[in-house]
Amino acid sequence: VKAWTPIEIDALSEILNLGMGTAAAALSRMTGCEILLSVPSLEFTTRNSVTTKLKQSTETRLVAVREPFDGLISGDAFLLFPEHRSLEIVRAILKETTPEDTLTEVAREALCEVGNIILNACLATLCNMLKES
């Protein structure tokens, strides 16, 4: 994994924030509610490291959405949510109550769709910026 400078990470975070804005607009249209998203943290790591971190996560149960990508750049993008936040997102999308402590199959599919919307918007914004430079 390439070592990124703080300036490069800041620039990429700004690009991803633009993608998050696009994703937030799409999710707002889906839910009929204003959705605000930001890039809380950005980390470059290997797939094995992500898997290890997910298995070792004991403080908060996490839900992950993975989006492989190929083209100008290739890799896997992971979007991680604390499980309780993922249930909030699903409730907003499905406009129904999901059990407090469980992700049903429909809820999992909805969360995957939300993750795909967010990750695709971010990756598309990144690719568009790379094509322009």
Where are these regions (language model features)?
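Composition-driven recognition of glycine/serine/threonine/acidic- and proline-rich low-complexity segments
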Residues: 1-133
